[in-house]
Amino acid sequence: MLVLGLETSCDETGVALYDSERGLLADALFSQIDLHRIYGGVVPELASRDHVKRMLPLIRQVLDEAGREPSDIDALAYTAGPGLVGALLVGASCAQALAFAWGVPAVGVHHMEGHLLAPMLEEQPPAFPFVALLVSGGHTQLVRVDGIGQYQLLGESLDDAAGEAFDKTAKLMGLNYPGGPEIAKLAEQGTPGRFVFPRPMTDRPGLDFSFSGLKTFALNTWQQCRDSGDDLDQARRDIALAFQQAVVETLTIKCKRALKQTGLNSLVIAGGVSANKALREHLERMLGELKGKVFYARPRFCTDNGAMIAYAGCQRLLAGQHEDLAIKVQARWPMESLPAL
């Protein structure tokens, strides 16, 4: 089955072709980072308009790269949520229109299920069951995964997601959007031990997260540096290091608890923050101590992309799932509500 996947949940327009027998044939991505940077974050209306502008050229590009025609497409998959409603509607409308025109089925894909399954695109994919850490700008969740659609939520952020905390901390120090890569870059030049940030909710049982207090701690530290006349460039580096260490160690502690609680020794990390080098190193070290293994997608498939949507959609289409000819999206959508395959 040849599936055309479309991703438009936020500020990246992603398109990919996935073949159930040959794997990923082609993928293309347009990022709107430059469009939103001057505003310090994503502007939903601008995101939607840009998806409209980019979608069809990217579809043509992917078909050309794969040497395929529209008549070769067996089905379409599109992100149906969660995400920005306007942005989601662009992808859903395009997918349903093409499915109707080409006479093929279409299936709506859960954005976070796409992230969770992205490591399946690698040469050595994880085997079920495993624990997944979904960590992005909008989500921070620990999930037990026994199969596609077989998800048990173990813990989640009670306020800011980890990626959101990265972005907000970067913004308060005057750094560019998106903040995650900026923080990671500065952290490499930070002075170890100058600042020590708390590890939120690690001193109590449970697998939930909270990052809003960490963001406030960073703000107070930054204001103290400004008031005392510190070298602000170095202060940014040192705060970035302390903040990143706190987030990474908090995530690592919770992942270790989740593995022990479930009795599993395989961990998948997915979502934009999973590309963070320090996080990968900490989790690999922790899994090594537990005689387990950590899995993640290549960096370009950690952030939003069409390949993960095409793959996830293909699995559900092969199981006989598809949507009626209607345009339906969900800004909020619990992943545990998905049907099991």
UniProtKB/Swiss-Prot annotation:
UniProt catalytic activity: L-threonylcarbamoyladenylate + adenosine(37) in tRNA = N(6)-L-threonylcarbamoyladenosine(37) in tRNA + AMP + H(+)
InterPro entries assigned to the protein according to its UniProt record, in alphabetical order: ATPase_NBD (IPR043129), Gcp-like_dom (IPR000905), KAE1/TsaD (IPR017861), TsaD (IPR022450)
Keywords: Acyltransferase, Cytoplasm, Iron, Metal-binding, Transferase, tRNA processing
Compartments reported by the entry: Cytoplasm
Binding site for Fe cation: 111, 115, 304
Pfam family membership, one: TsaD
UniProt-recorded Gene Ontology molecular function terms: iron ion binding; N(6)-L-threonylcarbamoyladenine synthase activity
Any single Gene Ontology cellular-component annotation: cytoplasm
Record-listed substrate binding positions: 134-138, 167, 180, 276
Top-rank lineage group of the source organism: Bacteria
Annotated EC: 2.3.1.234
Gene Ontology BP term (one): tRNA threonylcarbamoyladenosine modification
Cofactor descriptive note: Binds 1 Fe(2+) ion per subunit.
Cofactor(s) in the UniProt record: Fe(2+)
Role: Required for the formation of a threonylcarbamoyl group on adenosine at position 37 (t(6)A37) in tRNAs that read codons beginning with adenine. Is involved in the transfer of the threonylcarbamoyl moiety of threonylcarbamoyl-AMP (TC-AMP) to the N6 group of A37, together with TsaE and TsaB. TsaD likely plays a direct catalytic role in this reaction.
Family: Belongs to the KAE1 / TsaD family.
Name of the protein in its database record: tRNA N6-adenosine threonylcarbamoyltransferase
Source species of the chain: Ectopseudomonas mendocina (strain ymp) (Pseudomonas mendocina)
Gene designation: tsaD
